[in-house]
Design a protein with these regions (language model features):
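Intrinsically disordered, metal-sensing/regulatory segments
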Residues: 1-285
Length: 285
């Protein structure tokens, strides 16, 4: 398979993330359904986190086994530090980015107020400003999810490119199909937590490019450069970023909907992600 063909198929695999994004424009959903979708998003991300950390841990364990068999202990130490450091970097980077995205001026005061006024007005602030702040927070969280998924998808693109370059055409094709299915569910993961906030088409396109575009970029890099340390670095950073987002989704969903609904959604999302992975394994068998 040529580099151009591999890159084109990698782009298709990444573009399937757009299949789930239009759900964010649907407004005729009850609060309970929206909270369930947010929990479903957390479940999908939880599976991705499990999948990513498993792949990264396998690389580190193989380096350890190699060192025990007379290989380099330095390689193992480098891999271990990269794994731990990448995890921390991914989580802390998104925490910093969230603060930067939500940096805002104090809410403007509102004169007057009455018993019948909205809670925000009774507290002396402009309800419109409160609503705008909530909208910005929801869109920021959705974009953070897209960023975390994008880092993860870059590592998936690397796997596609490496398999194609090494002549394993069947494996490369299977990876493309499997990752395309994964990306389709990840689109739901991005818009699920928006909670009634209707994003613009421009926002959805940007989120799709950030979340799915790295699959295309990773495919190009993987076809030209085969580097296990590079793959480990992106897996670790992706794991940290996704872990941060899961924490944000869990805290918000439990506060709004309660534990039972949230746990049901998380289990459903995890099983959905696992099902797509089983399809990938079966197709490659």
């Amino acid at each position: 398979m040529s580099g151009a063909e591999t890159t084109a198929l990698g782009a298709i695999a990444g573009a399937t993330i757009f299949l789930g994004l239009p759900l964010g424009r649907v407004q005729q959903l009850s609060p309970r359904v929206r909270n369930f979708l947010a929990a479903l998003s957390a479940g999908i991300l939880l599976f991705i986190f499990w999948d990513v950390t498993g792949a990264a841990a396998e690389m580190i364990e193989n380096a350890l086994l190699g060192a025990e068999d007379g290989g380099s202990w330095g390689r193992f130490l480098v891999f271990a530090v990269m794994g731990a450091g990448g995890l921390a970097l991914g989580a802390l980077s998104l925490a910093w980015l969230e603060r930067a995205m939500l940096r805002h001026r104090p809410l403007p005061p509102m004169s007057g107020g009455s018993v019948d006024a909205p809670p925000a007005a009774m507290m002396g602030v402009d309800p419109a400003a409160v609503a705008d702040q909530a909208r910005r927070a929801a869109l920021a969280l959705g974009m953070l999810i897209a960023i975390g998924i994008g880092v993860h998808n870059f590592s998936e693109g690397l796997a596609i490119g490496v398999a194609s370059k090494s002549g394993e055409i069947a494996l490369a094709g299977t990876l493309i199909i499997g990752f395309a299915l994964h990306n389709a569910t990840e689109g739901f993961g991005i818009v699920g937590p928006l909670q009634g906030t209707r994003p613009t088409w421009r926002w959805l396109i940007l989120a799709g490019v950030i979340g799915g575009g790295p699959t295309f970029l990773g495919t190009m890099v993987g076809y030209r450069v085969s580097s296990e340390p590079l793959e480990l670095a992106f897996l670790a950073v992706a794991a940290g970023a996704i872990l941060f987002v899961i924490g944000e989704l869990w805290a918000g969903a439990v506060r709004r909907a309660g534990r039972n609904l949230v746990l049901s959604g998380i289990i459903g999302g995890f099983l959905l992600g696992f099902a797509t992975d089983l399809i990938l394994v079966y197709a490659g068998a």
